[in-house]
Amino acid sequence: MSSRDNDTSQSDHVPLDLTIEILSRLPAKSVGRFRSVSKLWSANTTSQNFINSFATGSLASRPSVLLTVRKGDILFVFSYPVDKNSSDGQFTCVGSYQLTNPNFGNLSRYHFLKWTQYRTKSYTSKMRNSIREVETVGDEVRLSDKYMYTMNVYPNHIESLVSL
């Protein structure tokens, strides 16, 4: 084989890092199907690094709101995707956690069903992939007659930052 043929065959291949970047932008269902293309693609799409970067990338591309509510020394953290086409004014919680002592970073699962935007007004920054506190009406939200909870809202958060 001449060196010219060798140069041509090398230029016909897409670099692996570019292939992985393209795969990371596809829907999860498509990535699952592409595992059967070759052993190399299967190994790359099932590696822990790819799975972590895929999850972070897909969460970063979806607009979402991170809501924290503090009751005494307990911090509740809720994650809500923001659907721009939704007209019902409700967020559906996709992830929620309870931190009993934020200094130690202990995280346990906690469930919270819905939060309507009519209970509080929040104004989200259009900046993506950053955690920024946004303005709310008041610093506290009354969820029952007896308890007051301090609330903070963060737009466009990356879920993996919560689970550190």
From Swiss-Prot:
CDD domains hit by this protein: F-box_AtFBW1-like
Annotated F-box domain residues: 9-56
Species of the source: Arabidopsis thaliana (Mouse-ear cress)
Top-level lineage group: Eukaryota
Name this protein carries in UniProt: Putative F-box protein At1g59675
